Amino acid sequence: RAVSFTGGTATGRNIMKNAGLKKYSMELGGKSPVLIFEDADIERALDAALFTIFSINGERCTAGSRIFIQQSIYPEFVKRFAERANRLRVGDPTDPNTQVGALISKQHWEKVSGYIRLGIEEGATLLAGGADKPADLPAHLRNGNFLRPTVLADVDNRMRVAQEEIFGPVLAVTTFKTMEEALEIANDTQYGLGAGVWSRNGNLAYKMGRGIQAG
């Protein structure tokens, strides 16, 4: 028999400390990086990056909540990403046309909304979404816990929005120049649940896979 726990990092550490010799399995959240190199298939990378953060309203431990884009393609990629994020349909999750539904509770909505405000205060640039409910929600949904898909660009990896799990539709975007820099910032986190690499260069992708501390 073993102890299995999915939840907060602090609680998981306390369980591990008291588990003694018992086997345990811990899934304690994530801040998964997605690294997009200049030779990537941009259309496929855009599709994947949108899905990894905004599917299931961003309430997924493996959400790609940090995206690192190589400097040479950064302006165009982040512009197109923000445009597509702004077009995602927020609304009733029972409607097949809806792409982003409501967060799990009012308390969690306030937490995620607070992180968006914090990111802006820390110096990030808001390119899509925001901390308020969508203005175009129909009357019967206005009391729901809805947030627009949010893109925070120009994020420094020391910011809290880059280091702490938000667990919502909020993306932190950073740029990098070299593979070495990408590895350094991707690994500069307490989490290591998942990661993604987009490149047509198999050797580069292999090296990144070996170097990223995740999985």
Listing of model-derived features with the role each one plays in the protein:
Residues 2, 8-156, 185-186, 212-213:
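ALDH superfamily catalytic-core signature
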Residues 7-8, 168:
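Conserved phosphate-binding and hydrolysis motifs of nucleotide-dependent enzymes
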Residues 35, 89, 139-215:
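Conserved C-terminal structural/oligomerization subdomain of aldehyde/semialdehyde dehydrogenase
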